[in-house]
């Protein structure tokens, strides 16, 4: 993307504030005209003094122009600042909404922290460009276009000096842009590496401290900063050189204007006031050219990060589902996989040709070794991923033909990682259903065996759970996640190893609650416990992404296939009768696999 295209696209983000932006720009154009008038009036004041003629009127007009310029500039600058900050937050919010709505595959490919880094850096750059556009860019262009003809009208010979100066500025800018293009792209790459390392180290701070990696991680950060500086310094050197060359050219231009002006005054071809006015023109043009140079510097330095942001934005529009898709309503819970295949990008892993049907209210246990595709299967049902081949239907409706929001309203999921926000316990449970009453929320917590431990906390339901639930134990986090799913009260329940972090006693209580809420509700369970599998209506045994066996527990035992071998090898956790000796779920392994 060229520099001009990047700049133009940045300005398109102002279209929602088009009227206000145009009004500010129009005011800036008027300011540019006033600015050009000032040196002319000042020159006439000098001529009036030199000729000892009436000066009051000219001086008054000049002073009024100056005061008006100051007041107008303050008002325009304030309006531009307010609009920029307001719109910066608006674009940030809109982009954030699109990013978090992206499928998990999008985040896995790009990296969530990387997407955040791109977003924040690009928003900062765009807001700086917006502000400069409304304050300076347009008025600078207008001033230059008006200034040159007026200068030629005053004295074409002195004007040639200004034209040469403008050409020198343009040539210097083109040279520096060409020399720094690759370097600036490398700088942006090193910025990403640095941010990624910092984010990675902090998010794994427990591992860093446990394995005494503080010195090594800090040393690695020093290496990243050194690489960044090695790439950044040549770019900075070129822009410093450009600044020096511009200053040299502008100084020489002023000297030339003064010398030529003195020569023409001596010959009687110019008045002193005209020379003074022309010097003012030259200084005005130099300031405008400096502004243009700074603008080019800003845009060039932002070009790489803006291109990444635009690429990310385009991908969100490309992946987003079509508008006006119908909603999934009155869900009964019949789920069917029709020859579903999904393969992870750049990997041989995935699920392949999966077909099965679950009737309304049935419980499905998904079993298999690590990496078999159990969680992938669940993610496909939630449209975290989209099948490469085949399709999934709920109540006979292809889930790709309905909008994701309505689909996910019909699903309540408890993940292996509880996924808590750094908010209060109350707010974390309320995520299940934002319109729920406190009584409904408390009841959900009781069902999930969470109410008692919550009441023992100092602030009870107002207790902050910390980042990702760091202030809670594993079991407490899991019970809050279950309470959240209970509160949602969706027709399809998904339990991704939901009780894996619970002790035996708590699990027994939670299992009773889950049995209660899964009654007459289609339930998918990624299972590692024998009792769960034994009471499932349908058991799916996955291996290497393929559905090897399916049927109820006894059918798979009688078959004597891979599921049977998994049981014999101790591949499922056998419940220990530490709570209720008479619990029907607690059976010896030999009884479970008895032929």
Swiss-Prot record:
EC number from the UniProt entry: 7.5.2.3
Gene3D superfamilies in alphabetical order: ABC transporter type 1, transmembrane domain, P-loop containing nucleotide triphosphate hydrolases
Keywords assigned by UniProt, alphabetized: ATP-binding, Cell inner membrane, Cell membrane, Membrane, Nucleotide-binding, Sugar transport, Translocase, Transmembrane, Transmembrane helix, Transport
Database matches in Pfam families: ABC_membrane, ABC_tran
Residue span(s) of domain ABC transporter: 335-569
Ribonucleoprotein keyword on record: no
Domain ABC transmembrane type-1: 21-301
Record-listed ATP binding positions: 368-375
Assembly and interaction partners: Homodimer.
NCBIfam families: chvA, PRK13657.1
Family: Belongs to the ABC transporter superfamily. Beta-(1-->2)glucan exporter (TC 3.A.1.108.1) family.
Main function: Involved in beta-(1-->2)glucan export. Transmembrane domains (TMD) form a pore in the inner membrane and the ATP-binding domain (NBD) is responsible for energy generation.
Name of this chain's protein: Beta-(1-->2)glucan export ATP-binding/permease protein NdvA
Species of the source: Bartonella quintana (strain Toulouse) (Rochalimaea quintana)
């Amino acid at each position: 993307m060229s520099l001009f295209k990047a700049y133009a696209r940045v300005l398109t983000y102002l279209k929602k504030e088009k009227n206000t932006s145009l009004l500010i720009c129009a005011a800036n154009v008027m300011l540019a005209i006033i600015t050009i008038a000032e040196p002319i009036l000042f020159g006439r004041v000098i001529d009036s003094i030199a000729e000892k003629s009436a000066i009051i009127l000219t001086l008054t007009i000049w002073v009024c122009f100056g005061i008006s310029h100051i007041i107008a500039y303050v008002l325009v600058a304030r309006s531009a600042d307010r609009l920029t900050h307001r719109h910066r937050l608006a674009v940030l919010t809109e982009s954030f909404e699109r990013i978090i709505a992206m499928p998990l595959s999008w985040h896995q490919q790009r990296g969530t922290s990387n997407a955040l880094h791109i977003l924040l850096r690009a928003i900062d750059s765009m807001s700086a460009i917006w502000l400069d556009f409304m304050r300076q860019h347009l008025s600078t262009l207008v001033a230059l276009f008006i200034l040159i003809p007026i200068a030629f009208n005053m004295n074409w010979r002195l004007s040639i000096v200004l034209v040469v100066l403008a050409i020198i500025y343009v040539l210097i800018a083109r040279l520096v842009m060409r020399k720094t293009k690759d370097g600036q792209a490398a700088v942006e790459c090193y910025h990403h590496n640095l941010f990624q390392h910092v984010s990675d180290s902090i998010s794994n701070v427990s591992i860093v401290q446990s394995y005494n990696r503080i010195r090594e991680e800090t040393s690695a950060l020093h290496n990243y900063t050194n690489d960044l500086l090695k790439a950044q310094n040549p770019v900075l050197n070129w822009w410093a050189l450009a600044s020096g060359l511009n200053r040299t050219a502008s100084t020489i231009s002023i000297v030339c204007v003064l010398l030529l002006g003195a020569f023409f005054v001596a010959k009687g071809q110019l008045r002193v006031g005209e020379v003074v006015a022309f010097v003012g023109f030259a200084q005005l043009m130099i300031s405008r050219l400096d502004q243009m140079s700074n603008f080019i510097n800003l845009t060039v330095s932002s070009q790489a990060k803006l291109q990444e942001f635009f690429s990310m934005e385009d991908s969100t529009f490309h992946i987003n589902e079509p508008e006006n898709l119908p909603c999934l309503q009155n869900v009964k819970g019949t789920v069917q996989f029709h020859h579903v295949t999904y393969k992870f990008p750049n990997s041989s892993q995935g699920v392949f040709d999966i077909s099965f049907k679950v009737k309304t209210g049935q419980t499905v246990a998904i079993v298999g070794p690590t990496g078999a595709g159990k969680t992938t299967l669940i993610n496909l049902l939630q449209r975290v991923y989209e099948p490469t081949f085949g399709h999934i239907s709920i109540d006979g409706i292809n889930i790709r033909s309905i909008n994701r929001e309505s689909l996910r309203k019909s699903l309540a999921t408890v993940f292996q990682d509880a996924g808590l926000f750094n908010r209060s316990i109350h707010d974390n449970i309320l995520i299940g259903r934002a319109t729920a009453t406190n009584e409904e929320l408390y009841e959900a917590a009781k069902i999930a065996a969470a109410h008692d431990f919550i009441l023992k906390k100092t602030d009870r339901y107002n207790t902050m759970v910390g980042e990702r639930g760091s202030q809670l134990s594993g079991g407490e986090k899991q019970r809050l996640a279950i309470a959240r799913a209970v509160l949602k009260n969706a027709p399809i329940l998904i339990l991704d190893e939901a009780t894996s972090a619970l002790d035996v006693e708590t699990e027994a209580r939670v299992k009773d609650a889950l049995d209660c809420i899964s009654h007459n509700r289609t339930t998918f369970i990624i299972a590692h416990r024998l009792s769960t599998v034994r009471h499932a209506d349908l058991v799916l045994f996955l291996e290497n992404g393929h559905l090897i066996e399916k049927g109820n527990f006894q059918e798979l035992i009688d078959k004597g296939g891979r599921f049977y071998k998994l049981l014999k090898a101790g591949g499922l956790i056998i419940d220990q009768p530490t709570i209720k000796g008479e619990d029907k779920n607690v059976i010896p392994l030999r009884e479970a696999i008895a032929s």
